[in-house]
Amino acid sequence: MNQKMESMAEEHPDATIDLRGVKCPFNFVKTKLKLEAMESGETLSVILDPGEPIANVPRSVQEEGHALLGVTERPDGLFEILVKKA
């Protein structure tokens, strides 16, 4: 899942949440709560561990109706996703 979209480089997120070390399903719950506190159209950067978190959180936010703008694997082995709130 090493997909990088141009929009991530150009996009400056309205908020960032660092969820390294947070296990499933708590990483999605924390992401969902953060998105609920944001305005429609705002963007959220989420830092996730490899494995289950990067497999599950992007899918779950899309199932909630939000837009996944990009996924980037960082040099430190973590992943960053950019989500636009519905």
Ranges and model annotations:
Residues 2-20, 62-69, 74-78, 82-86:
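Long, charged, low-complexity intrinsically disordered regions
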Residues 19-73:
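Amphipathic, hydrophobic secondary-structure cores in small proteins
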